[in-house]
Amino acid sequence: MTDRELPQALETAVQAGRLGVDAVLVQDWGLFGLLRRTLPDLPLHASTQMSLFTSGGAREIAADGCERVVIARECSAEDTRTICENCPVEVEVFAHGALCMCYSGQCGMSALIGGRSGNRGRCAQPCRLPYGLNAPAGKAYPLSLKDSSLAGHLGEMAEMGVDCLKLEGRMKRPEYVAVVTGIYARLLEEGRGPTPAEEAELEQAFSRSGFTDAYWKGTHGRAMLGTRSPDTPEPKALFDAARAAYEKDTARTVPVRFTCRIAADVPSVLTAEDPDGHTVTVTGAVPEAARTRALTAESVEERLMKTGGTAYRCSEVTVTVDDGLSLSAGAINALRRDALSALSEARTAPPVRRELPVPPLPEDTCRADAPQFTLSLHRAEQLSDGLLACSPARISLPLDVLAHETALPQREGLIWCAELPRVWRDRDEDLLRRWLDHAASLGVTAALAGNLGHLPLLRGTGLTVLGDYGLNVFNGRSLAYLKDKGLASACVSFELRFAQIRDMPKVLPAEAIVYGRLPLMITENCLVQNAAGCRRDREGPAVPADGPCRSQQLLRDRTGAAFPLLPAFGHRTEIQNSRPLWLADRPDFRRLGLAFARLRFTTESAAECAEIFRAYLEGRPAAGDFTRGLYERGVE
């Protein structure tokens, strides 16, 4: 969300809060911080696009006032249980619907290929197209996953403490929503798994070659892949029945608990309470002395139970009646009607929520006249004397690479930085802490954090924390939020235009990637393993020293473009853009107020890294094929 979009987003949230929405789902750090300060009583939920998949990340956002966390689709049952046991707020799980190959909130593929940002909800779904691994694209769809269905695991989720299910229905028809929601609601109410008939209905409603629950089970592989033919017929009979059902007046009734007191010489009193905590009390007629038959608690209960024709049903009733009194049936009915009417008003009344003034941004004090160059290397072998001779301000290496190093060359003014894995799990944190200790012993003094969950890992290490591109910094409010979290700088999103970066208030030293193959995806599935096969657990979560993923692997699309695949921590895959970003001959990036300009080296040799750095120092044009990225054209 850009700086110019934030005021309208805030106004929308204000109006939604006044209308009584239960919560606002937020992805952007800047908007989250702004809403927390201006609308402190409005519940906020963390979107799955915040890329939260550890209990540390969930606790971090909870400490800032978030009330529910939607965890990553890739989380297994074990991961989810760990988060539920260690997270102080509600946990929401993605239970049914389309799976992205990339971790949500980390995909640049749609933006860089088609100009539509998946991180802004405008994904053009390039993952549903054919690709070839080290071969021309044919009829294989290695990025297209089956839809997820966890209908058979609802009891397990309830037992571990999952609070909410997300049923994805983006771009789906209302009939689809009716079928899927209806089945899941029945399963929850009846505490059971789906029948074969219900499983068939879910598949008829929409699927891609069936469903998968592999992520939940902690497994992966090519069996998760699936496609859907564009000429797949609509399930007419199923959708007709669903349409007929939701067009009928079949609204579910709300259970209500009545407490009635009828005493001599005072008005009759009835209290009604619903499961959401709304409680109302009304008074009615004063009872008279009975002339013949006295009023009984049973007769009052019978009258109060008659809620037919209303949105309510009496689930429990407690009646206390003094002896020897009389109250007409009409008076009791009126008491019930008044109570239910008052309860309806209470249920529909918008909550009273504070609306505080918009806090000003801190002063734009971190705007630099010209950026210093920083480097990120994928391999230690890319380091050379020629590269060091160019005097970078900072060099970062992946933490799992630093773990195997015994020494780092030191230069005056050079900062060594550890790049933490973009994706990891709670079970990896002891290993990551050991690696951080080792990195510090080598002279590393800073760490790149691309996820909120990195922050608890880094506290107490003494390392300077720098925000990486995985945080999707899109506005000055996000910089302010991260500054409050203790970060010393932050890399802005490569989906921004030059003008948007220039106008962004620099309340924190800002960095931008100005060279390199931009990251398109990071995937839980290892694309090389899916195609060629290898033992996923050969060396724990670290990238294996041998195997097919260590050699050059290319994903090719229908146009022949080749996207390098790089192994990532946890046997994951990172897809790089087919062409490197080149801005050496464009002075624009030097005039944006950036403190740092990053050269991101991935597939380059040591000699190429040094030569490219020299080209940037001299402002030379590119020697080969390149892209200007999104800095000039922007994204939807």
Segments (PLM) and residue ranges:
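Surface-exposed amphipathic alpha-helical tracts and adjacent flexible/coil segments at the periphery
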Residues: 4-17, 26, 38, 42-45, ...
